[in-house]
């Protein structure tokens, strides 16, 4: 995980390398502040139920980012927190910025491969960091 910036009291963390649910689980487990989670991309047959409890405990907003968010929407529909769909990293970061509060962390930990919108996870991370810095 890579610290990106703190903007208006909100920390932004890049965990673009978390291309599976297990990696996202560890990232969420380490969060010590209320979290806005950005996730999504090319699903690899993920079992998202592995992170349900941590999302309920740690997150107050989910932001789905990708060309096809239908599996994420379907899975997390029963979790009673705001869920926002976006189709690019810039909109995902803007939505996170609008929904985060002072003291929160915005975490990009996608659970998915990056190939729907990016060349690879490094490209996704760079675009995330650039979008944060452009807020």
Model-inferred region functions:
Residues 1-59:
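Nucleotide phosphate-binding/pyrophosphate-handling subdomain across enzymes
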Residues 23, 71-72, 117:
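Phosphate- and divalent-cation-binding pockets in alpha/beta enzyme and binding domains
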Residues 115-121:
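Glycine/threonine-rich flexible loop motifs
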Residues 116, 129-135:
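Phosphate-binding loop of NTP-binding sites
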Residues 49-104:
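C-terminal helical cap/extension that packs against the catalytic core
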């Amino acid at each position: 995980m890579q610290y990106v910036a703190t903007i208006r009291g909100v920390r932004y963390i890049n965990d673009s390398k978390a291309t599976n649910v297990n990696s996202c689980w560890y990232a969420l487990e380490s969060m010590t502040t209320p979290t806005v989670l950005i996730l999504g991309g090319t699903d690899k047959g993920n079992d998202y139920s592995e992170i349900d409890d941590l999302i309920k405990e740690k997150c107050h907003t989910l932001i789905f980012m990708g060309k096809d968010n239908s599996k994420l929407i379907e899975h997390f529909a029963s979790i009673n927190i705001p869920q926002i769909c976006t189709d690019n990293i810039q909109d995902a970061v803007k939505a996170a910025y609008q929904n985060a509060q002072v003291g929160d962390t915005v975490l990009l930990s996608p659970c998915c491969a990056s190939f729907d919108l990016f060349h690879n996870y490094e490209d996704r991370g760079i675009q995330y960091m650039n979008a944060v810095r452009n807020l």
